[in-house]
Amino acid sequence: MPKLTLPKLDDVIAIDIHTHAEEPCGLHGDDGYDDFQERMAEYFKSPNKHPPTVQETAAYYRAKKIAAVIFPVDAERETGFRRYNNTEMLQIAAQNSDVLIPFVSIDPHKGKLGVREAKRLIEEFGVKGFKFHPTMQGFYANDRMAYPLYEAINDGGAIALFHTGQTGVGSGMPGGM
């Protein structure tokens, strides 16, 4: 796959910098992800039981002439939900490069494996950013365990985006997530 291209700013009226990349419903088998999404939809009063796919998200933003920074969240270790493969998400986003600006996500707990993946994604795809969700990923942003991954991101010229503050994720569910 060639390096990622970015939307032409003259073709959009705004950029949404916080858009989640979700897989189609049913791909997670019995790991609880679809039930989790259904409960999230109830909490946030969404008319949909599952968030839109990357393709549906692109179509929505394209119709509104808005670009979107889109990313998965690798919270596999903490939640037990299979993560959305970064490479697969990048390939779908590349097909919609007129409106999607893809970031990727790597759980800092992956250690050296995560560092290697970050370097590969930057070198092969030209990834510009990485999304972290400390609550969902079960770490503190200042945990030294994450520093090698941050260094790889910085050395590759990419940025890190952190979810901060309160989160609705897990609200109203057993254990609150």
Segments from the language model and where they lie:
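Helix-coil boundary/capping segments in enzymes
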Residues: 1-177
